[in-house]
């Protein structure tokens, strides 16, 4: 890695004076990475805020927007099924007299555990007391005082999840419980998808959260944003969609309406937007720029060849079922590195209003100051990577000093009346990712 070479260079040169300017400090990285950063650059002496950089003209004025969507009907059904399984399991365990016997055997109820040990996990202690209360069993006053709660809430799925996590995994030794009973209960929970990697999941399942993060409702969000931005900016629009996957299997769907393109990825986005553009009879032209596939409008062929010049060779071919007079697939002969700059050049000249690519472009040091709108259709939650992506849209452009930029973040949420009832950590993993992403952006608070 490049940083190893830099560290080695630093070791071998004496009396170095280092001036370090970092656009994106690794604030939310691992401790090891932060230590490495500090060893190389030294303590931070001054932090220049984004508003200061905008004021002095180093960055263009910009605005972040969060575009929320609800799950699709099918996704909502899957969420409901998970909730129903959790509720049914809670009710089943509440009726289980054997479970009650085992819970009452907990060492904390017979004074065998110290206060400090019991308070290591107050939420778990609360779940034990709430369970006893729900079974109309007197709660030891010492434990309730220890918890500092005059009144305990009713038993629900959240408290059952905490109780089962301790009973089945984290606090096994505190119970006088038959091993076979515990194994059968684990098998029962697993069969309902309520255990993932030795973690009881009755409120937030990784499988359900992944489905919501990848919600197909985000396709509609992207469609809405693209046509809204085009309505506002017309042919001056230079919109970049950054996502995580190419989805090459959708190449055969391009120009073939028999195929459904509801999926999150470069090629599904391209075809979805192209079809909608055709239906609306709009004049938006789209492009794709990835390491393994490049698509340009057919009328941009000559401009691309001029931009490439003598730096490389390319071939042009049909893409999917589209006519060669509509869009072209561009393939480099040999090393394709030169193609990125050439496509960026024709994008900046207006041969395309919307460019779709993967975040791997950032690793190639890619830049295009013409971008005036960015859709982050990526599941990156870290500040560092998010800021690198945002940075592509907030560059100043000397040819257009009046440039401003919009940055769009996509989040899938349950209907708002359900969100209001949920704890912050139960809203959705997608929402939590947005919070992590926004943590260090000045002025953005969610």
Residue ranges: model-predicted function:
Residues 94-354:
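Conserved C-terminal RecA-like helicase domain
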Residues 21-25, 243-245, 357-360:
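A short beta-strand-to-loop transition that corresponds to the Sensor-1 phosphate-sensing loop
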Residues 259, 275-281, 287-445:
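Conserved RecA-like P-loop NTPase helicase motor core
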Residues 10-16, 56-60, 231-234, 279-280, ...:
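Conserved catalytic network of the ASCE P-loop NTPase/AAA+ motor domain
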Residues 2-62:
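Post-DEXD/H (motif II) to motif III coupling segment of the RecA-like Helicase ATP-binding lobe
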Residues 2-4, 29-31, 251-252, 298, ...:
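Short glycine-/acidic-enriched loop or helix-start segments at secondary-structure transitions
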Residues 19, 44-48, 65, 287, ...:
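Hydrophobic/aromatic beta-strand patches that form the interior of the parallel beta-sheet core
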Residues 65-68, 75-107:
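Charged, amphipathic alpha-helical linkers/stalks
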